[in-house]
């Protein structure tokens, strides 16, 4: 395609930086990486890898395995079970390890599509789930290598956002300020 200023890419919750600048598509809502499909049935990254999706996975796993360390840590939580994942991982809980592996694999598979299209230098994991920290980063980085084509090996560096779950509001404030609002 020639003679256009923007080009639509099938990348749908996050953001892209291209040439050191925030990428803006033809319409607001570009780079919705969380809406990348994981299968033909329409399952998107957000449905399997967001904080609320991990909360659901944890509730289901704890109902099946009530003696796990993860179950013990979430027994009295009304919501936000994903916050218990990091401490349960630190205890070596196999239920927590299994959930992390599933989430990291799904996230890496979805991000492999972004990698094949954009070939970024780095993928930054932010939001509440990034509070799991290094175990999440390492698991996604390892899983991503299975899905990235050989020409892009070893694939992009995977990093954790310094802002954690504050990335979205801070980014929104930055964009509002940049727009002069």
Q: Where would I find each of the regions flagged by the language model?
A:
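Glycine-rich phosphate-binding loop of actin/hexokinase-like ATP-binding domains
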Residues: 8-52
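ATP-binding/phosphotransfer module of carbohydrate and carboxylate kinases, centering on a glycine-rich
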Residues: 22, 40-181
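Short, small-residue-biased leader/transition segments that mark boundaries at the very start
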Residues: 1-9
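Glycine-centered small-residue hotspots that permit tight backbone geometry or close packing
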Residues: 3, 13-15, 104, 108
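Structured loop/turn residues at beta-strand edges in well-structured enzyme cores
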Residues: 2-3, 31, 118
